[in-house]
């Protein structure tokens, strides 16, 4: 590529909110949990895994070894609901063997965390409504408790559950009257007042 690493942030800022770190990740040289800065070759231990978007690390040997198959899967959606393929079946066979408990045999695959949270909420709403109807309760059961300082995405339902450091990002979006509670956490420095809370 002809773009110089030191020009990347300025180039991106022309079209996106480029308020991320100054480090420019070298996708070829980064490895394991180490990010290599494309600008100067410095290495940084990744302690935040791109907010869980990069939890496997960088250039995992098994993934690199199988990049031809992964490339094929990247350009063709494999988890189609109406027509199937060998890669989907192979994955689901392994998934069922190692990750599916006997009491949760059904799977539903979705593209991304926000949409997964949305579908979990819809499942919970449906379940609660059915429980209430079976008990003769007319209420919908559509209330949710969530934590302060949480991030669950910026799609419909998840927007209410997400706290943002910049309220301008969501101030005109409709939200639900759900219940926000403080998340359990330890604050530093630890003193006698903090220890009383533990």
Describe the function of each predicted region.
Residues 2-5, 14-17, 24, 43-134:
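Glycine-rich loop-to-alpha-helix module at the N-terminal edge of alpha/beta enzyme cores
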Residues 4, 17-19, 48, 143, ...:
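Short, functionally important structural connectors and interaction interfaces within domains
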Residues 22-31:
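Short loop/turn motifs at secondary-structure junctions and domain boundaries
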Residues 37-39:
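Short, acidic, Ser/Thr-enriched surface-loop or helix-capping motifs
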Residues 93-198:
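PLP-dependent aspartate aminotransferase-fold enzymes
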């Amino acid at each position: 590529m002809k773009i110089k690493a030191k020009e990347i942030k300025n180039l991106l800022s022309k079209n996106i909110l480029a308020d991320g770190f100054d480090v420019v990740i070298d996708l070829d040289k980064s490895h394991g949990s180490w990010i290599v800065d494309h600008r100067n070759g410095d290495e940084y231990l990744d302690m935040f895994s791109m907010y869980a978007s990069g939890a496997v690390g960088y250039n995992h040997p098994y993934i690199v070894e199988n990049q031809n198959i992964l490339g094929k899967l990247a350009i063709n959606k494999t988890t189609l609901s109406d027509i199937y393929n060998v890669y989907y079946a192979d994955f689901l066979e392994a998934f069922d063997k190692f990750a599916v408990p006997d009491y949760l045999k059904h799977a539903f695959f979705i593209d991304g965390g926000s949409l997964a949270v949305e579908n979990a909420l819809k499942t919970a709403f449906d379940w609660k409504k059915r429980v209430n109807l079976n008990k003769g309760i007319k209420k919908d059961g559509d209330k949710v408790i969530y934590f302060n300082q949480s991030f669950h995405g910026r799609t419909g339902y998840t927007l209410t559950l997400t706290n943002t450091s910049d309220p301008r990002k969501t101030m005109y979006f409709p939200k639900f009257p759900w219940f926000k509670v403080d998340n359990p956490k330890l604050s530093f420095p630890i003193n006698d007042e903090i220890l009383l809370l533990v």
